[in-house]
Every structure is written in structure tokens, then in C-alpha cells.
Amino acid sequence: MSIKSDRWIRRAAEAGMIEPFEPGQVRTAGGNRIVSYGTSSYGYDVRCADEFKIFTNINSTIVDPKQFDEKSFVDFKGDVCIIPPNSFALARTVEYFRIPRSVLTICLGKSTYARCGIIVNVTPLEPEWEGHVTLEFSNTTPLPAKIYAGEGCAQMLFLESDEVCETSYRDRGGKYQGQRGVTLPRT
């Protein structure tokens, strides 16, 4: 497997792999500095959309991935999401992805957030998976933390295999195939 360059990412985006797509790095908006997004040397920095689900313990439920209670979250829509101390929020990417059959995509958090104690977690985007990426933000600090919608939040790295997989995510009918919006756990 080899990591793919900015040139490859641009060609794949022309074929519909990332929509909407930014061919370069965007670092300012309206004359203000922002957390960068767009194509980098060997990756693509995604943006966070303005839809969030913030963890709450108002209902004092137990978190169970097999029987997840939607009441564990408070829905929020806005330009800035404030995650409570030592808490968690879900969001989604602005970008919609269509991963080629020979590609596995790994997501890493951006250092701007990591250096503030905000960790972004996303599982790999498997071959032939498509959808909005659900982003998991953990605020590891004892203070409230801000996440900015419309700005960069994580980087996607594209790894292409020299051999196409036997069974893709689409072939096996993956439960998150075609997801739109912030998607909660499914079993």
C-alpha cells in the first residue's frame, strides 16, 4: 500500500471521490485566520459541518453501543459548538466521500485541536464506502472546548493497495453505507 499525493487526490476528486472539494489549502475566510482545510501534500483536511450531537447525562442513562439511547445527546446547529469539560460530541464532515475499491482511508486529528486537548476519532473509510463521515470529538480537558463549523478538523490519508480487495464495504452491505448527517451507532 502506498500513500497518495495531492495530484492523485485531485484526480480522484474529479471522478467524484470528495464533494465538495477544495484543490488547495484554505487558511483564511473573510480576512480571518481559520483552521485550514483542503488538499495538502499527502492528504485532505476535512471540514466540520454545523450539525452536532453533544453528550448529556440529563437522563442518566448508561451508554450501550448495542442499544444506544438517542436521549444521550442534545442536538445543536451552529457555527461554534461548545463541548463541556471531559465530554464528547458527534458531528459530520461537510464533504461526502466515495472511496474507490482499491483504497483505504485513514483519518487523523489536526494538531491545532490536539494541542488544545480535543481529540478527533474516525474509524477507517473502507473500500467502496460512501457517505458523510461521522466525526467523534472528545474534550479531554477540564474546561469547555470550541469546535468551529466550516473549518478544518481532521485529515484524511488515502492508501492504495496493489491488489483490489475480494469483498468491499459495499459488497457486504455495510451498515453505515450512504450515511448522511450525523449517524448514531448501529448494530
Curated annotation (Swiss-Prot):
- Domain of life where this protein originates: Bacteria
Which residues of this UniProt protein bind dCTP?
110-115, 134-136, 155, 169, 179
| Pfam families, A to Z | DCD (PF22769)
Q: Which family does it belong to?
A: Belongs to the dCTP deaminase family.
Supply the name of the protein.
dCTP deaminase
Q: How does the record describe its quaternary structure?
A: Homotrimer.
Q: Which GO terms describe its molecular function?
A: dCTP deaminase activity; nucleotide binding
Q: Which residues form the active site?
A: 136 (proton donor/acceptor)
Top EC class, one word:
hydrolase
Natural source organism: Bordetella parapertussis (strain 12822 / ATCC BAA-587 / NCTC 13253)
For this protein, the Enzyme Commission number is 3.5.4.13
* GO BP of this protein: dUMP biosynthetic process; dUTP biosynthetic process; nucleobase-containing small molecule interconversion
Provide this UniProt record's keywords sorted from A to Z.
Hydrolase, Nucleotide metabolism, Nucleotide-binding
Q: In which pathway does it act?
A: Pyrimidine metabolism; dUMP biosynthesis; dUMP from dCTP (dUTP route): step 1/2
What does this protein do, in the record's words?
Catalyzes the deamination of dCTP to dUTP.
Q: Which reaction does it catalyse?
A: dCTP + H2O + H(+) = dUTP + NH4(+)
